């Protein structure tokens, strides 16, 4: 029987059809994804039984599937890495950490979705099934180690995301967002395929490990061209400048719960892909891709936070904010040190809670007013202290104000960057963090400082809270959970630091990269 690490196409070429049937695919490694798939099928089945049955049973089915996936991921922590699908997927600590972020972001996104779907008249079962399909693609992408599995996972995530963006069929802005996302995403997929074909032609393999070895022995200009194509796809997925143009329009036009998932789950999968393919495949071009990522990080932090200053829509402001946040996370990737990788993982976990908490508040406000204009939040503290407090804490955390969770995440990133000599990135990060604090505090000031007579017309006509309505208890629970984690997580951040460090320590790919970097430094 061929080794599990043997490239997929190599095995297919040397084995007969009968032998292929006897190969172990080691489905245990993808058991969490299996539960997500079962939940997806379950939601489709109950949706066939009628809308009322779907509304009743879709939420518990989703909770059971995602909860089971998170529990199994927890049991797999710090275990020996396992390969699946003939070496096309690996379950190590790094993939477990990012798969957990994706699954948890989906769970919270669903908790804040039910009331929104009910009020907009959207079919609940279909929405949940498409979101679970996107989750399945994102989770598989986090552990993919073969060009074929990467492309399949990437397209599963992308196609489901296009459908989610245009889910409000009667809303012209939602349809426009879906079309823009589809066109740009299709171009990114074509660019990735071209880069992947070059890599396969140069190495004769689709395995990232085999490609990395081939490029180290004979780096060529064609490999550098493939790097540019692959990097463009990664930058599109994480919404880095200048591949960010789709982000503001898609975020503004898409349903708000969908935007919440795209801003965290999809972005986390993009960063997992970046590490897998750049660290595992392009070690021979280490200096080149780090230089390119440095430029992307500086542009993303600068443009994202500066343009956010001029926004009047809350969702567009958070769209540009997410571009800036991607720039911060890239600091850890550019460092290429143990502290850098750990800081990147830690910040993605922190970003999960503070960003989804902010979106939960925005959804709650839009459900009552139908608006996402920043000016309409004026004087909100008088009518809704919960949204005011929750949104204020989450925005302060995104800005990096102590003692919020986001502060410790940024400090860890800046510390890792400074220790590695990435002074430009750290300085730009500090300056743009100050800029971001300005527009975050402007929103807080709008909600809190305004006198009663200066409150917006929508706030003056603010309806009474009906917490017993369908979907409202889960929305409140998600909001309180995210706000609590954002506020208290900073004070109790030591377990998160240990978790992020063990994610790096339990990942052979990162340990090999660190060893190579140390040897290179010793020779230099």
UniProtKB/Swiss-Prot annotation:
Keyword Transport: yes
Assigned keywords, A-Z: Membrane, NAD, NADP, Plastoquinone, Quinone, Thylakoid, Translocase, Transmembrane, Transmembrane helix, Transport
Top enzyme category: translocase
Signal sequence bounds: none
Membrane topology: Multi-pass membrane protein
Alphabetized InterPro entries for the sequence: NADH-Q_OxRdtase_suN/2, ND/Mrp_TM
Enzyme Commission number, as recorded: 7.1.1.-
Any one GO BP annotation for this protein: photosynthesis, light reaction
Catalytically driven reaction(s): a plastoquinone + NADH + (n+1) H(+)(in) = a plastoquinol + NAD(+) + n H(+)(out); a plastoquinone + NADPH + (n+1) H(+)(in) = a plastoquinol + NADP(+) + n H(+)(out)
Assembly information from the UniProt record: NDH-1 can be composed of about 15 different subunits; different subcomplexes with different compositions have been identified which probably have different functions.
Similarity-based family: Belongs to the complex I subunit 2 family.
Protein name (Swiss-Prot/TrEMBL): NAD(P)H-quinone oxidoreductase subunit 2
Organism lineage: Bacteria, Bacillati, Cyanobacteriota, Cyanophyceae, Synechococcales
């Amino acid at each position: 029987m061929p080794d599990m690490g043997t490239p997929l196409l190599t095995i297919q070429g040397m084995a007969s059809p009968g032998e292929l049937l006897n190969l172990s695919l080691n489905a245990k490694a993808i058991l969490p994804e299996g539960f997500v798939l079962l939940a997806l099928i379950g939601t489709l089945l109950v949706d066939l039984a009628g809308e009322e049955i779907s509304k009743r049973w879709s939420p518990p089915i989703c909770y059971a599937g995602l909860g089971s996936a998170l529990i199994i991921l927890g049991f797999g922590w710090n275990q020996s890495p396992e390969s699946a699908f003939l070496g096309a997927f690996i379950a190590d600590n790094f993939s477990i950490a990012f798969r957990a972020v994706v699954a948890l972001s989906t769970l919270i996104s669903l908790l804040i979705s039910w009331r929104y779907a009910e009020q907009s008249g959207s079919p609940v079962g279909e929405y949940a099934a498409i979101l679970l399909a996107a989750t399945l693609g994102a989770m598989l992408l986090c552990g993919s180690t073969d060009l074929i599995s990467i492309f399949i996972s990437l397209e599963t995530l992308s196609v489901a995301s296009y459908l989610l963006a245009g889910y409000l069929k009667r809303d012209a802005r939602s349809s426009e967002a879906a079309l823009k996302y589809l066109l740009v995403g299709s171009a990114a997929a074509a660019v990735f395929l071209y880069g992947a074909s070059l890599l396969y032609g140069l190495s004769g393999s689709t395995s990232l490990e085999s490609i990395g070895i081939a490029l180290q022995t004979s780096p060529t200009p064609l490999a550098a061209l493939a790097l540019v194509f692959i990097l463009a796809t990664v930058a599109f997925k994480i919404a880095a400048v200048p591949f960010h143009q789709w982000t503001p329009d898609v975020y503004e036009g898409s349903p708000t719960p969908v935007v919440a998932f795209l801003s965290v789950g999809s972005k986390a999968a993009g960063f997992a892909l970046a590490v897998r393919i750049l660290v595992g495949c392009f070690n021979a071009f280490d200096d080149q891709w780090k230089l390119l990522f440095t430029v992307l990080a500086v542009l993303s932090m600068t443009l994202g936070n500066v343009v956010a200053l001029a926004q009047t829509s809350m969702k567009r402001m958070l769209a540009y904010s997410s571009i800036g946040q991607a720039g911060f996370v890239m600091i850890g990737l550019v460092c290429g040190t143990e502290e850098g990788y750990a800081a990147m993982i830690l910040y993605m976990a922190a970003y999960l809670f503070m960003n989804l908490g902010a979106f939960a508040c925005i959804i709650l406000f839009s459900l009552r007013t139908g608006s996402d204009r920043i000016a309409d939040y004026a004087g909100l503290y008088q009518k809704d202290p919960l949204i005011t407090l929750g949104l204020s804490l989450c925005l302060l955390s995104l800005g990096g104000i102590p003692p919020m969770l986001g502060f410790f995440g940024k400090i860890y990133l800046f510390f890792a960057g400074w220790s590695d000599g990435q002074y430009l990135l750290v300085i730009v990060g500090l300056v743009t963090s100050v800029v971001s604090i300005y527009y975050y505090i402007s929103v807080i000031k709008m909600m809190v400082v305004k006198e009663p007579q200066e409150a917006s017309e929508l706030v003056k006509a603010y309806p009474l809270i009906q917490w017993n309505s369908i979907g409202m208890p889960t929305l409140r629970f998600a909001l309180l959970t995210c706000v609590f984690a954002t506020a208290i997580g900073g004070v109790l951040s030591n377990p998160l630091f240990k978790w992020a460090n063990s994610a790096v320590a339990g990942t052979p790919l990162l340990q090999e990269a660190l060893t190579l970097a140390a040897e290179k430094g010793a020779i230099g």
